[in-house]
A protein has these predicted regions:
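Phosphate/NTP-binding elements of NTP-utilizing enzymes
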Residues: 2-267
Length: 267
């Protein structure tokens, strides 16, 4: 039986020469290697929250959330910002009790198709069916996202709400009375996630008050294709570089990958 190793960017497959040599010397070991590797790939696809692979930038975001109240993740299109943020949010949801997280997207369409879809991708597979109980409710469709733009994770009784920047612009009182984050102040205490934030400081400043009582953190994502907005530029003002990395496409020039923003006390 011919063994076809699935291509994967992170799990290296044996070369044709190695396959031939091992197949001749120890066919059973080759088959075990094949099954183990294919099993890792399938597990990462079926349950990326618990068995998936982290990009280096995600670990930097996670570390920033441990040290600062706000983390701004910058990156180009298809750099994995949204997926990484969704994984961190779901880590907080599944590990910590009785929390409340609010997630913002540009509009209803991007909320369903991008932000809610990325959260659903990270949902543990045993909850990827309609779940309804006293302590939890999950109902999702690709067409409409989460029913009521919200879900409650049963095992932790943590609620996640999805809202849009348009909603806040039309009514800046929609967050009145809420506290976001987790009361027990865990290590990964995320209270809000703002994806592709293009607005001014109004929403961020409002959320700061809603996060303060639970000492929870704010996660923001932004794609600087056409430069920085005035609000994002505030983070960049007098920023101190904490870590650099050689840029392959720039001839190995060292570029910042982690910075500290004193203007916002953020990473």
């Amino acid at each position: 039986m011919e063994l076809l190793f699935t291509p994967h960017p992170l799990i290296e497959a044996p070369t044709d020469e190695e396959i031939l040599l091992l197949g001749e010397s120890d066919p059973k070991a080759l088959e075990e290697l094949y099954r183990a590797r294919e099993g890792l790939i399938k597990a990462s696809q079926d349950d990326p929250l618990r068995h998936g692979f982290d990009l280096a930038g995600w670990d930097r975001i996670r570390q920033g959330l441990m040290e600062y109240n706000e983390v701004l993740a910058l990156g180009g299109n298809r750099s994995g910002k949204t997926t990484g943020c969704a994984k961190l949010v779901m880590e907080a949801v599944t590990k910590n009790q009785d929390g409340h997280i609010v997630c913002f997207s540009q509009n209803a369409d991007t909320s369903v198709k991008v932000q809610q879809a990325s959260i659903w991708e990270m949902m543990p597979k045993e909850f990827k069916k309609k779940t309804k109980s006293i302590e939890g409710y999950i109902n999702f469709s690709m067409q409409n996202g989460f029913t009521g733009s919200s879900f409650i994770f049963p095992d932790t009784r943590t609620r996640v709400d999805f809202k849009t920047y348009t909603q806040f612009s039309n009514n800046q009182t929609i967050l009145e009375g809420f506290e976001f984050g987790f009361k027990n102040n865990p290590d990964l205490n995320i209270g809000s996630w703002l994806d592709e934030y293009l607005g001014d400081a109004a929403l961020v400043n409002t959320l700061r008050f809603r996060l303060a009582t639970r000492n929870s953190k704010m996660l923001l994502g932004f794609t600087p294709i056409d430069g920085f907005t005035p609000f994002v530029a505030e983070y960049q003002r007098d920023a101190r570089t904490l870590a650099t990395k050689p840029a392959e496409l720039l001839g190995g020039v060292e570029v910042p990958v982690v910075q500290y923003a004193p203007a916002r006390d953020a990473s």
